[in-house]
């Protein structure tokens, strides 16, 4: 049986890894061991933050809705309760966008929520 040497595969794997580490500072983009650790950490951060991004945006939407609702004399929790009772099915993303881009429409929604409470 022929002897298998791994030179070609190792070079291919290292090249792929260093390609992923492109743009990193210093030895993080040049040395294979350091680059591997850095890429692994970067991929873990990306995985974690894809999940955190959902939380962060929801938090941002709630802050924006709360601020806009308080400008109309209503707290966030009372506003959301009023929407639920009025049967208005708008999600937080749409409400936050409406509060920023179309304040007139948002004020009409607040009035409907106020009547339902």
UniProtKB/Swiss-Prot annotation:
InterPro entries cross-referenced by the UniProt entry: Ribosomal_bL20, RIBOSOMAL_L20_CS, Ribosomal_protein_bL20_C
GO biological process, one term: translation
Family matches, as SUPFAM superfamilies: Ribosomal protein L20
Keyword Nucleotide-binding listed: no
GO molecular function per UniProt: rRNA binding; structural constituent of ribosome
Keywords: Ribonucleoprotein, Ribosomal protein, RNA-binding, rRNA-binding
A cellular component term, taken from the record's GO annotations: ribonucleoprotein complex
Keyword Transport: no
UniProt cross-references to NCBIfam families, sorted A to Z: rplT_bact (TIGR01032)
Function comment: Binds directly to 23S ribosomal RNA and is necessary for the in vitro assembly process of the 50S ribosomal subunit. It is not involved in the protein synthesizing functions of that subunit.
UniProt record similarity statement: Belongs to the bacterial ribosomal protein bL20 family.
Protein name in UniProt: Large ribosomal subunit protein bL20
Organism, scientific name: Roseiflexus sp. (strain RS-1)
Gene assigned in the entry: rplT
